[in-house]
Amino acid sequence: MNIVGVWEVRADSAPFAYHVMVFHSDGTMLQSNPDHGNRVTSDSNGMGTWHANGSTVSGAFLEFTVDRTTPDSICRGVVQFEFTLHDNEFHGSASAMFYDLDGTPRRGPLTTDLTGRRFDARTYSIPAASSS
């Protein structure tokens, strides 16, 4: 089993449940979701590392958040995750902690269940462009 690739991920308890995660073969990963999915903060993309032990994948990513109403309120978020890979799906959980830039905890831990499905462009049909 191999986690490397692009995944559609649902984190039910997150401010916006739908995410895209990319796992690279060098043990790095990326996480992204729509900026305005979270109405309270603007969040950067998440960037982190992962490792596998059999079918169990664990890791963490870093993101920065800024309060939409008080732009001077900046936090560093660290999201840890662990899930079990089953072919082209995974199930597990994540926990997020948010800190001031000096390292003082501000929020968390915030937990959520994770489910993921491998993205394969061959399984999606894209409508042909109209020739008007």
Where are these regions (language model features)?
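Acidic surface patches and DE-rich sequence motifs
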Residues: A11, H24, D100
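Short, cysteine-centered beta-strand-loop-beta hairpins and adjacent loop/turn segments enriched
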Residues: G37-T41, V66-S73, F98-G108
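N-terminal glycine/threonine-rich, aromatic-flanked beta-hairpin/loop signature
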Residues: F16-S58, E63-D67
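Short beta-strand segments enriched in hydrophobic/aromatic residues
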Residues: A11, E63-T65, A96
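Hydrophobic/aromatic beta-strand elements that line small-molecule binding cavities or substrate pockets
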Residues: H19-V22, G46-A52, R76-L85, S95-A96, ...
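Edge beta-strand at a domain terminus
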Residues: G54, A96-S132
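Tryptophan-anchored aromatic micro-motifs
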Residues: M1-F16, G46-G48
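Acidic, glycine-rich flexible loop segments
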Residues: F61-E89
